[in-house]
Amino acid sequence: TVKVTVTGAAGQIGYALLFR
């Protein structure tokens, strides 16, 4: 669903920022 896609995108962004 769209919700899963949005959550996945947010997770990827958060992960990237966390290990920036």
Curated annotation (Swiss-Prot):
Keywords: NAD, Oxidoreductase, Tricarboxylic acid cycle. GO terms for molecular function: L-malate dehydrogenase (NAD+) activity. Its EC number is 1.1.1.37. It catalyses: (S)-malate + NAD(+) = oxaloacetate + NADH + H(+). It is an enzyme of class 1 (oxidoreductase). Disulfide bonds: none annotated. One of its GO terms (biological process) is tricarboxylic acid cycle. The keyword Cell cycle does not apply. NAD(+) binds at residues 8-14. Belongs to the LDH/MDH superfamily. MDH type 2 family. Catalyzes the reversible oxidation of malate to oxaloacetate. This is Malate dehydrogenase. The gene is mdh.
